[in-house]
Amino acid sequence: MNIDVVLLLQQNPILLIFVVLAIGLAFGKVRIANMQLGNSIGVLITSLIMGHLGFSFNAEALTIGFMLFIYCVGIEAGPNFFGIFFRDGKHYFTLSMVVLVTAVSISYFASHYMGLDFGLSAGMMAGALTATPVLVGAQDALNSGLATIPRNMEFSLVLENLSVGYAMAYLVGLISMIMFAKLLPRLQKQNLSDSAQQIAQERGLGGSGQRKVYLPIIRAYRVGPELINWTDGKNLRELGIYRQTGCYIERIRRHGILAHPDGDAILQEGDEIALVGFPDSHARLDPSFRNGKEVFDRNLLDLRIVEEEIVVKSDAIAGKRLSDLNLSEYGCFLNRVIRAQIEMPMDLDIVLAKGDILQVSGEKSRVHGLAERIGFISIHSQIADLLAFCSFFILGIMFGLVTMTFGQVSFSLGNAVGLLLSGITLGFLRANHPTFGYVPQGALNMVKDLGLMIFMVGIGLSAGGKMFEHLTQVGPQIIGIAFLVSVVPVFFAYLVGAYVLKMNRALLFGAIIGARTCAPAMDIVNEYAKSTIPALGYAGTYAIANILMTLAGTILIILS
């Protein structure tokens, strides 16, 4: 049996999509100079080659790809967006606006000066900023009629220009941002590591702001004469065992009766006590604990230690510092703090926001008691609330179709903005109502990444046919403008953040990278800072920048 592979792929668009995805994802794992190409570049290059070979793509599949992507971006941003915007928005919003206003200005004036065709400037800016939301906003403005296409151009040609501009500028944007992350920390006067340590000292952090994560252990001891002498008649509150060592007494057996002690309890000779703490905490116990006979009793040691992710929801807790939680009162241990999927430094002075996730371990009843106070335990379920997911998706599309009229001017927000807003709403409601709209993070990541990759396949296949033709005609101009769009806004943001906003350099670099939504550069800055402190700045600008970039794409294509 003979199989014509080319004909098979041309007649089966779904098969073509996944063939390009599989080859592109495999290609993305290739490393060049210790840097992995990544999924986006792998899929983009593969689809460009396939497009150049004459393969085409279904435009409807391209549309569903970007819709799913932008909707999931909104859901991820929702839990933290309003808190960041209204509480810490001054610096983060300013930096995001500096980056985008500068990028839009350079793209608009440079493309007009160079005489680039309609659509190339928006695609080029999206690629230079490595920001797919810019491209999504521009394309949706065309689909909704918000942007007017020149009379001498076909709609398909404009979409092709968007794709070509994006594809040609993407590598320029990614490489230049990574170079910025490597070079600018060296060129500035302040050492990034020193800046991170300064924040660490001001906020009570130690070292890198990281710690190993492991569950506490339980050990039991019989109270002997040495320990009685050490306690000197003081109650547990006065002894401050937790403050000194990080261990706390979970149970006491006295005269055969098990009990949970309170702060007023006084140890007596012959008591058997169960202590909970990390291994290094047990090692800090006074020798009079360990010199007593260690007890191996199933009933005494039968404690259920759990590790849960607690989502901050309470209005009384949001806006307070981590130190205000007084975890020692609950006998709980904090392992990590996660905001916008970014692990934060273990900073006792970090201000909590709704939607923050605290990974806490301890005895089950104590952890659940803490969760009732600050929010709720994240549902560890593999079942997504598809009804809410689909309903808000529909609402987003419907909202984007609403036409508003001002005098003789009519316009609609379009699918991109509508889905972004509905996604933010769903994410926000999910952060405040644990049983509503739950989507496992793994499932959300898969839908978002799949939508983005399908969108990238469409971009590459659409651009591939004309890619080399454009390279010979306007390639140098697009690459030159893309370099300016990628680099100049970053330097402006650095100057504004450093000398106008007076931001700490470690936080500033994280915030700039968040404004550029360039995750690969984040690891480089953390490495230079020898800390995860820059992640505080990254999380602050990331949610805001994703929203503004979608609007920037819409604005630029309208102005072009």
Swiss-Prot record:
* One GO CC term, this protein: plasma membrane
Q: Where is the RCK C-terminal domain?
A: 203-292, 293-376
Question: Which GO BP terms, alphabetically?
Answer: potassium ion transport
User: InterPro entries this protein is in?
Assistant: AAE_transporter, RCK_C, RCK_C_sf, Transp_YbjL_put, YidE_YbjL
Task: Please provide the record's keywords in A-Z order.
Answer: Cell membrane, Membrane, Repeat, Transmembrane, Transmembrane helix, Transport
Report the subcellular localization.
Cell membrane
Short name of one Pfam family for this protein?
TrkA_C
Membrane disposition? Multi-pass membrane protein
Instruction: Note the PROSITE patterns from the entry.
Output: RCK_C (PS51202)
Top-rank taxon of the source lineage equals: Bacteria
Annotated signal sequence is none
An example Gene Ontology molecular-function term = monoatomic cation transmembrane transporter activity
Q: What is its main location?
A: membrane
Instruction: Write out the transmembrane intervals.
Output: 5-25, 37-57, 66-86, 91-111, 164-184, 386-406, 409-429, 443-463, 478-498, 506-526, 539-559
Q: Which family does it belong to?
A: Belongs to the AAE transporter (TC 2.A.81) family. YbjL subfamily.
Q: Which NCBIfam families match?
A: PRK04972.1, YidE_YbjL_dupl
What name does UniProt use for this protein? Putative transport protein VV1438
Q: What is the lineage of its organism?
A: Bacteria, Pseudomonadati, Pseudomonadota, Gammaproteobacteria, Vibrionales
